[in-house]
Amino acid sequence: MLEKFERYPLTFGATAIEYLPRLTEALGGDVEIWAKREDCNSGLAMGGNKLRKLEYIVPDAIASNADTLVSIGGVQSNHTRMVAAVAAKLGMKCRLVQESWVPHEDAVYDRVGNILMTRLMGADSRIVDDGFDIGIRQSWEDAIQSVIDEGGKPYAIPAGASVHKYGGLGYVAFAEEVARQEADLGFKFDYIIVCVVTGSTQAGMIVGFAAQDRADRVIGIDASGTPEQTRSQVRQIVDNTAELVELGRPVREDEIVILNDYAYPAYGVPSNETNEAIRLAARTEAMITDPVYEGKSMQGMIDLTRKGFFPKGSKVLYAHLGGAPALNGYSYTYRNG
């Protein structure tokens, strides 16, 4: 479905799928847990899922003759780290709005992890004291205008690269890649677990797996804490992406599966259960997840497995999207592991 779209390679290639035997055993052994390691996909600033999206956006940025990538995220945004990395790789400037999305007061929160790496790569990173919202923000529009006012030519990339016209394509490619890997493995996964906030990762998966008639097996774990807004944005991106790739049919509402039980107490704030999930993944598989995104999807997968959501014998694929650098912003929380 993606043949007509130009792709600028930023990743190593197909990401590894690995079986997680010790986590499987810790969860009772009746459901096989596997992981697709999007967190290990590139040498660019520790990689992550945003690079898969940006591969389909960069050709448009280059064609526009822009000299500055402009994007937005929270203080510990993985996305803005990846935009900064791409700008450095392409020899472009980068201006970033880092909003105060998370009610978290660790003393080093705005000086370590993602934002430290972002600044190290030369991005002009500006902290704005606005709260969490996945929609289009005035602060981002102001940043775009500021580049124009200074004589630059901006290329605008929204939060998470999600509502960009090509934002869903990378994870259509993910679904096609999984199908090829399943052919090599000799089986198909029964469920795919993915974190969802700004929406295009799950939306792209839904469209890609809809072409394989199994979109409803993509289980989104909401980490936004604003489930109605997130679902609406996923729906928007699904429809746009399905039209772009000429899926040939509308995606049904029941094919968009998002569970809202794990985002508490707030976006970017881990619950005790999130922390327990982070520790279990680390101590059984040395797989590092973060308290904002992957810790919550890990929590969701663990809880669903324990309460019998997945039938006995199921093979579950956990999409590890990255995000470990944010752990540095929670140094007090994890000071003892």
From Swiss-Prot:
Provide the active-site residues from the annotation: 77
Q: Which CDD domains does its entry note? A: ACCD
Q: What class of enzyme is it?
A: hydrolase
Q: Which reaction does it catalyse?
A: 1-aminocyclopropane-1-carboxylate + H2O = 2-oxobutanoate + NH4(+)
One Pfam family this sequence matches: PALP
What is one process in the GO biological process aspect for this record? Answer: 1-aminocyclopropane-1-carboxylate metabolic process
Q: Which residues carry this modification: N6-(pyridoxal phosphate)lysine?
A: 50
Query: Would the keyword Plastid turn up in this protein's UniProt record?
Result: no
Q: Does the keyword Signal apply?
A: no
Q: Which GO terms describe its molecular function?
A: 1-aminocyclopropane-1-carboxylate deaminase activity; D-cysteine desulfhydrase activity; pyridoxal phosphate binding
Assembly mode: Homotrimer.
Q: What family does this chain come from, according to its entry?
A: Belongs to the ACC deaminase/D-cysteine desulfhydrase family.
Known function: Catalyzes a cyclopropane ring-opening reaction, the irreversible conversion of 1-aminocyclopropane-1-carboxylate (ACC) to ammonia and alpha-ketobutyrate. Allows growth on ACC as a nitrogen source.
By what name is this protein known?
1-aminocyclopropane-1-carboxylate deaminase
Origin organism of this chain? Answer: Rhizobium radiobacter (Agrobacterium tumefaciens)
The beginning of the lineage is:
Bacteria, Pseudomonadati, Pseudomonadota, Alphaproteobacteria, Hyphomicrobiales
